[in-house]
Amino acid sequence: GLHRFVDPADDKVYLYTQFETADAKRVFACFDQPDMKATYALHFKAPEDWTVISNGPVSWEGDVASTAIDYPLSTYLVALCAGPYHEVTDTWRGELTAHPEGKPAQKLEVPLGIYCRASLAHALDAERLFTETKQGFDFYHRNFGFPYPFGKYDQIFVPEFNAGAMENAGCVTIRDEYVFTSQATHYKYERRADTILHELAHMWF
């Protein structure tokens, strides 16, 4: 459903959704089964100093944030994150080189975003995370033969998450224990990279 968290570090409020397997119905009326897909027009009323992240690009009119999902999508892959999230952006640029029909290489560009609580901004190693994400985009486009389908790609580190991460289309949520606030072992970095690449692979599968 929709999870609300008050950060004990600064009393700021954060929201995010987790709908897998069948909890979208806790937030909006739907037939909550993965074989029944729909398009969506989403509108969220939120404080204007909040960041709202969803599957598609978000536009604001006053205190209402809106987005649309104009392709058929299962309800469990719809996502919303809202709050005073710290934001870092980048862009992946590459090409599709392994088309099954042998077509010429296709130039591609995907906007990337990484988000975390404001109180964790000092610990967010965004450059490393972007590097690993871009390496994943390079590898998958080199081997899968189909371009990334969801426009932009955001990764949001969220608190009190009850799994490792969730492959919401274009709006992946990840447990914020992966924002390391003290020296981490090589194993922890490997586990985080594995999670990042696992969720990115879900954008194709």
Annotate each language-model stretch with its function.
Residues F5-V6, E20, E101, W204:
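Compositionally biased, intrinsically disordered low-complexity segments enriched
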Residues D10-V13, P34:
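N-terminal, polar/Ser/Thr-rich
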Residues I196, L200-F205:
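Active-site His/Glu-centered metal-binding helix of metallohydrolases
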Residues G1-A9, S66:
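A surface-exposed beta-strand-loop module
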